């Protein structure tokens, strides 16, 4: 029923100019990601590439019911104001039928409202903030992605299940610090952390937000040294994650476990290049990368699709590690173009 509703809504949006669409046999899609600026290396560029591969494959297979997808790729430059302005341009000047993509939740929240007000269709591939939808009553914006409070819950439940066996401490004795970039993404995950860790009986000894653009996180490191947590739950982008880890090591901050929640924490190749073996001590909560799933448990043909995605990424990027953001971009786009449209 949900798929039928989505399909009906999308059809009504796409076919407002039915005669012209039928003649051109095209669907114009505006794709917004950060290909430059700090968010690019934090997962946005990988998300863009995954999205691009899915669109290319759909077109190579004949498009969506014979309609070729015509993507207009836009670089938001890691700036919210650029993402908003480009959304307006794509809707009003390029006359796109669909807006999709979006890595940053700080961009996603205002973009979703603009697209919904314009009564156009938006499909969010990567941004996770629960604030995109919470209490908004959006009618034309959709996301198959996990929500930020769910990510925050997941890390706490993981700790609750493994505290005794892996850390040698009862849950009630576990001291947790929650640190996060103070935008919609970080605040959303931290809210889930705070709620669920306390529900499970853990001691939250510090909860502190910071600006993702901060040039110095040493005051935060000092607070953590005073709080002496067993576990640090960190939600950040890039390069704030790198800055924090570097300054934490310089100041001798110790922990039993550090758990990240996506973005820069999911870019393992970059973490290993910067921190070498220290990166082995970092865990991450994220949707599972497609290549880590057993293809026999998936719908027929999905294993071959995943292999093609990996092949194209390795050929373009010349990398051995495939970040989960490639799968996010690819999978969410494939769902839209093959199952919804």
Per-segment meaning from a language model:
Residues 249-330:
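Extracellular/periplasmic periplasmic-binding protein-like sensory domains
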Residues 24, 48-71, 163-171, 198-202:
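Signal peptide-proximal N-terminal region
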Residues 42-47, 56, 61-135, 144, ...:
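Beta-alpha junction/loop-to-helix N-cap segments that form part of ligand/metal-binding clefts
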Residues 16-22:
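Sec/Tat signal peptide C-region and signal peptidase I cleavage site
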Residues 1-9:
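Bacterial N-terminal signal peptides that target proteins for export
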Residues 332-341:
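Extracellular/periplasmic bilobal clamshell ligand-binding domains
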Residues 27-52, 74-81, 103-104, 179-188, ...:
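Extracytoplasmic "Venus flytrap"
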Residues 49, 96-207, 258-284:
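Extracytoplasmic ligand/sensor domains, especially the bilobed periplasmic-binding protein
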